Structures are given as C-alpha cells and as structure tokens.
Amino acid sequence: MGFIFSKSMNENMKNQQEFMVTHARLQLERHLTMQNEMRERQMAMQIAWSREFLKYFGTFFGIATISLATGALKRKKPAFLVPIVPLSFIFTYQYDLGYGTLLQRMKSEAEDILETEKTKLELPKGLITFESLEKARREQSKLFSDK
C-alpha cells in the first residue's frame, strides 16, 4: 500500500515540476515581451521627441539664418554667418534622427560591436556571481557590526 501511495506521490511531484517549468517559461516569455514592448515605446518616444524638437529648432534655425544673412549683407561683414555653421550641425543631426537613417546606422554599428568587439563589453572583474555578492555582503555587515 505504501508503494502505491509513493508512486502516485512521485507522479504528482513530477507533474508539479513540469507545471512549474512551463509556468516559469511562460513568465520569462511574458517578461521578455514586456521588455521589448517598453524598448519599442521608448524608441518611438525618442523619435517623436526628435521630430517635435525639429519643428521648433527648424523655425529658430530658419529665422536665425535669414536674420544673420541679412545682417551680413547689410553691414558687409561675413562674420555674421559664422553662427550658422554649428546651428546647421544640430539641425542636420536632429533631422537625421527624426526622419533619416541615423537609428538604423546606430543599430548596425551596435550589432557589429556585439559581434566583433566582445572584449570591450566585458565587466571589469567578470560577471557578478552569487558568491561575490555574498562576500561583499558579509564584508559590509562586518563593517556595520564593528562600529
């Protein structure tokens, strides 16, 4: 009788473990999906912010360019045109980010770094392990207990 009882307990235990593994897998998949959704939303917000900024900065850039060009022509001083150069870099960068291919170029560069330059991505003392965390926790608790 004990054998039959233990056999059914083993089956129940096995079923429970399978359920837990399946549940953990589902939880992990949901978590990864949620993280990806959050990343996509953050990227969309960044692009939207860049486009919105471009509207205001583009207006400022246009007015500044016209004003500086007019001042340079009226006063016959080409030095008035100098501020247009850095403003044009900012305008071009924001346009490229909002409507151009900057994000695709950054993505391909990041993928290239991940594939070919792995050593630059390593942590200084390697991956954090449970043992290293426990060691640091013990050392920290010793400091507090000594005081």
Curated annotation (Swiss-Prot):
Key words of the record: Cell membrane, Chemotaxis, Inflammatory response, Membrane, Plasminogen activation, Transmembrane, Transmembrane helix
User: Which residue ranges does the entry give as Extracellular-facing topology?
Assistant: 1-52, 100-147
* Stretches that traverse the bilayer: 53-73, 79-99
Can you say where in the cell this protein is located? Answer: Cell membrane
Write out the topological domains of type Cytoplasmic.
74-78
Question: GO biological process annotations for this chain's record?
Answer: chemotaxis; inflammatory response; positive regulation of plasminogen activation
In which tissues does this protein get expressed? Expressed in monocytes; detected in differentiated monocytes but not in progenitor cells. Expressed in adrenal medulla and hippocampus.
Major location (coarse)? membrane
Q: Name one GO cellular component term.
A: plasma membrane
Q: Which InterPro entries match?
A: Plg-R(KT)
| Topology of the protein relative to the lipid bilayer | Multi-pass membrane protein
Subunit info here reads: Interacts with PLAT. Interacts with PLAUR.
Q: What function does this protein fulfil?
A: Receptor for plasminogen. Regulates urokinase plasminogen activator-dependent and stimulates tissue-type plasminogen activator-dependent cell surface plasminogen activation. Proposed to be part of a local catecholaminergic cell plasminogen activation system that regulates neuroendocrine prohormone processing. Involved in regulation of inflammatory response; regulates monocyte chemotactic migration and matrix metalloproteinase activation, such as of MMP2 and MMP9.
Name of the molecule in the record: Plasminogen receptor (KT)
Q: What organism is listed for this UniProt entry?
A: Mus musculus
The record lists the lineage as:
Eukaryota, Metazoa, Chordata, Craniata, Vertebrata
